[in-house]
Amino acid sequence: ETTQALVTHPAIKSVDFTGGNVFGQWLIDNCRQARVYAELAGVNNIVIDSTDAYKPMLRNLAFTLALYSGQMCTTSQAIFVPAAGIDTEDGPKSYDEVCADLARAVSGFLSKPEVALAVLGAVQSADTLKRINEADSGALGKVILASTKLENPEFPKSEVRTPVLLGCDAADEKAYMEERFGPISFIVKVADTAAAIALSERIISTHGALTAGVYSTKADVLDAMTAATMRSKVALSINLTGGVFVNQSAAYSDYHGTGGNPAANASYADAAFVANRFCVVQRRYHV
């Protein structure tokens, strides 16, 4: 109530918000006296079609899913993999192989406690712990990699959890088509790459996203994904395998959000993010 009274006060002319949809939408609907710049929830996703750097791709994804225990608004939640699998430099990999290999990559990356604790940080709320436990139970999909609890001797009261990976079919939309904040990701089996791109676009257009990614060695696939993300207005990362990650999307070095899909009504930080906070007031008189 205190916050609501503050942000609707006539003297408040600019409101910046990052958080969940419910209060974010309340701000947009009720702060009529102010400009509201809101970053809300979305379903960030990645399409995997093919790769010529299979292990580097897995390492990159493992870091992405683990960083800050998935508690970044840019972290990928849904990874779309064709039912027939993907092509790699080591030959074809089935959907099940991709699932198992990504699980091994995450586990291997976090196998050293000093690395795991530095990358994961800690879970920030009891609600996130509940979501992790729900995912671990298998209620949302097949458990490919269960979350485990780690102890941090420097912060003995902290709640540290490794990522949980779930497998599901594209038809299981209730499971993966909403933001599940925390280290929870879905490897979604889709009919083919075209279906994956179409699904990615539909999710972003209807539910929003701050980031999208694609892995493919084929120019036509990259062109199709680029076109889809232009229509749905989301930042696209292509074939990231090194020290740059899809969830590292920061204002000033990148554009954080676009303001063009439901995940945010502004881009942090394009010219409008700054200029729209000001107005021009003129005065005239005879000389």
PLM features per residue range, with description:
Residues 9, 40-42, 73, 178-183, ...:
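Short glycine-enriched loop/turn motifs at secondary-structure junctions
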Residues 28, 34, 52-80, 87, ...:
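C-terminal segments
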Residues 18, 82-84, 168, 190-191, ...:
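Structural motif
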Residues 69, 173-178, 198-205:
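Short, flexible, solvent-exposed loop/turn segments with mixed acidic/basic and small polar residues
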Residues 15, 82, 183:
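Residue-level signal for inorganic ion chemistry
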Residues 158-174, 180, 184:
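Non-catalytic terminal/interface segments that mediate subunit docking, oligomerization
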